[in-house]
């Protein structure tokens, strides 16, 4: 959400409300609590790739906001197809058990594209900073899905961080209307 807020300010001259900024900080605190245990080990390469992915996602939201007439379904379908074509070659489904394969197929074939379609459509009605507030909920949901599907019990920090994330997103998106700046982007 931080990158989406900054980029929408730079590219679209959209302001982010103080309430949304507070929610962003609180949400990021929850994410740090969730991943805090894994931050101590490993190299920086994975962190840099994750940071790059977050920045590309923010750029994506800003582009959707700037161009509300882009055909959402077509663009999401084309990008999903390209993603499939790029990843199908190196993938080896025989390395996954049946549950993992079904979960992967469900995510890539249904949940991922539907989520991207919803996100891209939401930018017609809300600034990228607010739309991106929903993405940290995916981190919480992923932990729950792994718990339900694979019986991998999340750490206590995951529950605490997840509660912080959900409460922060709820706080950021349910405030009084005067605290939300619904100003639409200026067309180029």
Pin down the residues of each PLM region.
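Transmembrane alpha-helical segments that form core, pore/gating elements
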Residues: 4-6, 39-94, 104, 183-188
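Hydrophobic transmembrane alpha-helices of multi-pass small-molecule transport proteins
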Residues: 7, 16-36, 53-57, 81-87, ...
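A helix-boundary/kink motif common to multi-pass secondary transporters
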Residues: 12-17, 71-72, 127-128, 150-154
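C-terminal ends of transmembrane helices
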Residues: 2-16, 58-70, 116-123, 173
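Transmembrane alpha-helical core positions of polytopic small-molecule transporters
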Residues: 1, 35, 53-61, 83, ...
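Short, Lys/Arg-enriched, Gly/Pro-containing loop segments at transmembrane-helix junctions
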Residues: 124, 178-186
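Structural signature of hydrophobic alpha-helical transmembrane segments
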Residues: 42-55, 98-112, 158-165
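Helix-helix packing/entry segments at the starts of transmembrane helices
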Residues: 64-82, 113-148
């Amino acid at each position: 959400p931080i990158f989406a807020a900054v980029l929408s300010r730079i590219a679209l001259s959209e302001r982010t409300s103080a309430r949304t900024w507070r929610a962003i900080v609180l949400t990021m605190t929850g994410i740090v609590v969730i991943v805090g245990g894994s931050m101590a080990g490993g190299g920086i390469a994975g962190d840099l790739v994750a940071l790059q992915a977050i920045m590309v996602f923010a750029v994506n939201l800003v582009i959707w906001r700037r161009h509300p007439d882009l055909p959402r379904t077509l663009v999401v379908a084309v990008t999903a197809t390209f993603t499939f074509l790029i990843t199908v070659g190196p993938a080896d489904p025989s390395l996954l058990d049946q549950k993992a394969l079904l979960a992967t197929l469900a995510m890539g074939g249904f949940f991922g594209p539907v989520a991207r379609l919803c996100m891209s459509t939401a930018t017609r009605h809300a600034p990228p900073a607010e739309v991106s507030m929903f993405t940290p909920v995916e981190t919480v949901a992923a932990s729950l899905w792994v718990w339900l599907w694979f019986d991998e019990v999340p750490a206590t920090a995951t529950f605490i961080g997840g509660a912080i994330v959900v409460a922060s997103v709820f706080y950021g998106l349910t405030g009084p209307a005067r605290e939300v700046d619904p100003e639409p982007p200026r067309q180029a």
